[in-house]
């Protein structure tokens, strides 16, 4: 199950390590195929849950790693990646809030930082050769550490299945809690959890209740709606129900409030970067509430041209994030440009949560361009409706000229 030794002078490798079956097998495989190089395991804590980190260091060392670095990125992830992305209005193919995609650049950056710290000359990831993540990670590595060799075992070794990996570890007396039966492939962070594989590979199959792990089934959610208040400053949620919170804490509180109401579930078939389509079920409870609140305030404060521009930026940004182009000049420019609009996104929103829905039902902002006096359908003293006639004649002038020329 090994390959011909492909060592090209690699002495120390930093592996993006999760403790799962794949990365547990990668550690001994690297030693065998890269001249017994030193393996440094690296795990990014992006809010996937404490249970995922318990015993991780011991497991990495038992598999053959010399060190294991667990880096807490939760606050930075929300503050510097999730919030800026949401400020652009990015949403991939009209539905996906990019939970997995946003996590990849910060993980890759931290992995490079660990590599620099320990003096490594190579980076390794456990992404398959069919997915988006291989491109995302290696694109970030190219931008941040083009001098470091990148090793992608799934594109090199001959193992094809979980059974192969389990047999490989058993041959080397490396213990694992994994089993041959794994129904779904899941990826979690503070923002969301994704589910792929199993019955989901057939788009004619409705996801079973066992797919979802974070949110309640909307059918089983409370019959009584719950209202949650969000206060926003410069496009960032700063308070939830009147309580001042850090970015990460605000997201966690919204997750806890929205998940029991079944908020944030989507089932989509998306276009992968590598060309194929894939089906995924995503749960993003707190992020869905945040997105609804930010859009509600934008409705009040952005004029027509600004909102149109933001929508264009959001569409472009969604593809950049999804395609792993975070560390590019265009991404940097779009993020910076969006900040100027975010300066006016201030106010308070009340979101109603009910059986899978998150609807902004109240909103106010000190920067609001909405004027009840101008918008009213009743009698008013500030807007003379006769003024609209001249505007309409000028607005439709091109159409009028075109029609006259056609006669």
UniProtKB/Swiss-Prot annotation:
Annotated positions binding L-citrulline: 96, 101, 132, 136, 185, 194, 270, 282
Pfam family, one: Arginosuc_synth
EC class (word): ligase
Keywords, alphabetical: Amino-acid biosynthesis, Arginine biosynthesis, ATP-binding, Cytoplasm, Ligase, Nucleotide-binding
Main location: cytoplasm
Pathway: Amino-acid biosynthesis; L-arginine biosynthesis; L-arginine from L-ornithine and carbamoyl phosphate: step 2/3
Binding, L-aspartate: 128, 132-133
Annotated localization: Cytoplasm
EC assignment: 6.3.4.5
One GO cellular component, as annotated: cytoplasm
Any one GO biological process: urea cycle
One example GO MF annotation: ATP binding
Catalysis performed (reactions): L-citrulline + L-aspartate + ATP = 2-(N(omega)-L-arginino)succinate + AMP + diphosphate + H(+)
Residues binding ATP, per UniProt: 16-24, 44, 126
Entry similarity comment: Belongs to the argininosuccinate synthase family. Type 1 subfamily.
Subunit record text: Homotetramer.
The name this protein goes by in its record: Argininosuccinate synthase
Organism: Shewanella oneidensis (strain ATCC 700550 / JCM 31522 / CIP 106686 / LMG 19005 / NCIMB 14063 / MR-1)
UniProt lineage: Bacteria, Pseudomonadati, Pseudomonadota, Gammaproteobacteria, Alteromonadales
């Amino acid at each position: 199950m090994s390959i011909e030794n492909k060592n090209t002078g690699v002495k120390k490798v930093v592996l993006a390590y999760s403790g799962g079956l794949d990365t547990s097998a990668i550690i001994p495989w690297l030693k065998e195929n890269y001249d017994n190089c030193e393996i440094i395991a690296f795990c990014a804590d992006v809010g996937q849950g404490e249970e995922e980190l318990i015993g991780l260091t011991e497991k990495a060392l038992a598999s053959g790693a010399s060190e294991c670095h667990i880096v807490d990125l939760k606050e930075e992830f929300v503050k510097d990646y999730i919030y800026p992305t949401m400020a652009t209005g990015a949403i991939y193919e009209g539905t996906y809030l990019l939970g997995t995609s946003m996590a990849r650049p910060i993980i890759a950056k931290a992995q490079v930082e660990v590599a620099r710290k320990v003096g490594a000359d190579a980076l390794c990831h456990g992404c398959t050769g069919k997915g988006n993540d291989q491109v995302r990670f290696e694109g970030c590595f190219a931008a941040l550490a083009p001098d470091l060799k990148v090793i992608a075992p799934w594109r090199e070794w001959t193992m094809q299945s979980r059974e192969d990996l389990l047999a490989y570890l058993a041959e080397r007396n490396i213990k694992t809690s994994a089993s041959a039966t794994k129904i779904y492939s899941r990826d979690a962070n503070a923002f969301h959890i994704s589910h792929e594989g199993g019955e989901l590979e057939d788009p004619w199959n409705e996801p079973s209740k066992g797919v979802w792990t974070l949110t309640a089934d909307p059918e089983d959610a409370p019959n009584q709606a719950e209202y949650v208040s969000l206060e926003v400053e410069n496009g960032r949620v700063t308070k939830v129900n009147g309580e001042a919170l850090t970015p990460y804490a605000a997201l966690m509180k919204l997750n806890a409030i929205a998940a029991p109401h079944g908020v944030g579930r989507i089932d989509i078939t998306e276009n992968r970067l590598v060309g194929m389509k894939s089906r995924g079920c995503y749960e993003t409870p707190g992020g869905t509430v945040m997105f609804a609140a930010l859009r509600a305030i934008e409705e009040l404060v952005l004029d027509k041209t600004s909102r149109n521009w933001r929508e264009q930026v959001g569409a472009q940004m969604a593809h950049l994030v999804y395609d792993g182009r975070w560390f590019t000049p265009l991404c940097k420019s779009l993020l910076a440009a969006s900040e100027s609009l975010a300066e006016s996104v201030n106010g308070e929103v009340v979101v109603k949560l009910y059986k899978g829905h998150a609807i902004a039902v109240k909103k106010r902002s000190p920067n609001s361009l909405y004027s009840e006096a101008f918008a009213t359908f009743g009698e008013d003293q500030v807007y003379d409706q006769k003024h609209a006639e001249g505007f309409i004649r000028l607005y439709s002038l091109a159409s009028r000229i075109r029609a006259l020329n056609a006669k």
